[in-house]
Amino acid sequence: MTTATHNQIVNAIRGKASQIVPKGATVILFGSRARGDAREDSDWDVLILLDKDRITSQDIDDYSYPLRELGWDYNQCINAILYTKRDWDSSISSPFRENVTEDGIRLWG
């Protein structure tokens, strides 16, 4: 994938996030696409931190699914993982959080 295409997809994710996620949310690209060591078939990992008490199935429909659909426009797989900010803040010692903190790129919020 060219740098221009990569940047186009990053900007598309950022744009979609600005349309769909609520005020107070944070959107972070993480994984191989954020680190710059992705293969051609690598997916796009996106973390969405929501400022609410719990994640519901409606949140998945409202925030994860539109990003998955966006990926189809580019023949790419975009996987969004949802956390509440409270749950994220309480997972300080998790390897997942450490990886996102080290490699993640904030796209929105």
Predicted regions and their residues:
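Short beta-strand->loop micro-motif that forms the acidic, two-metal-ion catalytic signature
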Residues: W44-L49
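Catalytic core of pol beta-like nucleotidyltransferases
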Residues: M1-I28, R35-E40, D51-G109
